[in-house]
Amino acid sequence: MVPLILLILLFSKFSTFLRPVNHVLVTKYTAIVNTKWQTTPSIIDVTYTMHVFYMTIILILVRKQMQSIHAFLGSLCLPSHVLDFSIVRDILSWYFLETVAV
């Protein structure tokens, strides 16, 4: 449970921190591609690909944590609607989609 919370907090800070890093990486990537293939890739495409890469890693980590979260929630004797796995999954999916969309 704690690693997931730390991961969410880290990602919320990390996504704002990565914006300048993304810009540098996109600039370097564009320079390499321009030199080797004489083409200009869309900066939006490259940035989107980087965000998809980050999100894939985070979602893999979240998926591994979901089983332990579900067991933890079950141990709290909460009402059954709180224990619905799909609600937890939907909330996390919404959070990550909103973070990437910004």
Swiss-Prot record:
Key words of the record: Membrane, Transmembrane, Transmembrane helix
The keyword Membrane belongs to this UniProt entry's keyword annotation: yes
Location(s), subcellular: Membrane
Transmembrane segments: 1-21, 42-62, 68-88
UniProt membrane topology term: Multi-pass membrane protein
Highest rank taxon of the organism: Eukaryota
Broad class of where this protein is predominantly found: membrane
CC per GO annotation: membrane
Name of the molecule in the record: Uncharacterized protein YMR254C
